[in-house]
A protein has these predicted regions:
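Conserved hydrophobic/aromatic packing and binding residues within compact polymer-binding modules
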Residues: 42, 56-57, 67-70
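A short, Lys/Arg-rich alpha-helix, primarily the initiator
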Residues: 14-49
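Short amphipathic recognition helices of helix-turn-helix/homeodomain-type DNA-binding modules
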Residues: 80-83, 87-119
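Recognition helix of helix-turn-helix/homeodomain-like DNA-binding domains
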Residues: 61-76, 86
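Hydrophobic protein-protein interaction segments
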Residues: 118-119, 127-136, 141, 148-296
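Alpha-helical residues within the helix-turn-helix
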Residues: 47, 58, 87
Length: 296
């Protein structure tokens, strides 16, 4: 496949819908910095990071008095000071850009479309990783868990779910936990659901993204059988949690790993996540290594 063909394929896969979310009214606790003044945004992020003014001032190497004046609106920070505050608050690139906009500065991080020529090398690398991971499933998702790319094994795992869940943008978490999605096939649904929702909550705490909050609320509302309630806190906890699901080849069990671009300075690329699944037992490994001639 040529680079141009790769770009064309990704352009068809990634629609404007993937990068757009309808945001409903969100409570102050989960509000986005989009709707706040600079002082309100800084106080919100301080609260989310559990930092006092003294803590943040020390981390950012600014005086507590100056930070207090910035938060109260009595002083305007320089761009340099604001970036130091953003770094001390551990803000993702998107949120750093928004903090700069709120203060009247231009954002410093680009947000390119996946179809941009500048993204070509990174996306070729992503596709190479997904392809090399075969015959084990692997996929790439954006910040809202919308599907960007997947290898053949991962696509096979989605066969048979409600077609409405496969309309772009395909949300991987919705497709997993929806009653007409993969949920009926997952044998340890309660445990996996608890694990994923906890991870999603951490993502929300990190980004204050109302679209992720809405997704968390939606997923939390999906039913699951009473027989699949979360395990007792007294039960032995394994080293890692695997997802076990029923397939045409029998029960398959996977461990998951998460990979991100460690040096990304583009918002879109920094938010791209690769989810790679490995066999959690020998039976699953042998079944997948036998080839892709049989459907999963």
């Amino acid at each position: 496949m040529t680079n141009q063909e790769c770009r064309s394929r990704w352009t068809k896969t990634i629609t404007s819908e993937v990068m757009t979310s309808t945001i409903q009214t969100v409570s102050l606790r989960h509000m986005s910095a989009l709707s706040t003044t600079l002082g309100e945004a800084l106080r919100m992020w301080r609260a989310r990071r559990r930092l006092s003014q003294l803590d943040l001032a020390g981390e950012a190497e600014v005086s507590t008095r100056h930070l207090s004046f910035i938060e109260s609106g009595r002083a305007s920070p320089s761009r340099h000071v604001l970036l130091r505050l953003a770094e001390a608050l551990r803000l993702p690139l998107r949120e750093q850009n928004q903090l700069l906009r709120t203060a009247g500065f231009a954002p410093i991080y680009e947000e390119r479309a996946f179809s941009s020529p500048d993204m070509e090398n990174a996306l070729v690398a992503v596709e190479a990783v997904l392809r090399a991971h075969a015959p084990f499933p692997a996929l790439a998702v954006d910040r809202h868990w919308n599907l960007v790319l997947a290898n053949d094994t991962a696509r096979q795992m989605l066969i048979g779910i409600d077609e409405r869940l496969l309309r772009p943008p395909v949300n991987v978490l919705r497709a997993t936990f929806h009653p007409q999605g993969l949920a009926p096939r997952i044998l340890n649904l309660a445990e996996w659901r608890h694990h994923v929702l906890s991870r999603l909550r951490r993502d929300i705490d990190q980004s204050a993204d109302p679209a992720l909050e809405a997704l968390h609320t939606e997923l939390s509302g999906f039913p699951f059988p009473a027989s699949r309630r979360p395990p007792s806190s007294t039960e032995r906890i394994a080293v890692t949690l695997s997802i076990r699901s029923e397939a045409n080849r029998g029960v398959m069990s996977f461990l998951s790993t998460t990979t991100v671009f460690g040096t990304a300075v583009d918002v879109t690329l920094a938010e791209l996540t690769l989810e790679c699944f490995y066999p959690a037992d020998e039976k699953t490994r042998k079944s997948l290594m036998e080839g892709m001639t049989k459907p999963l």
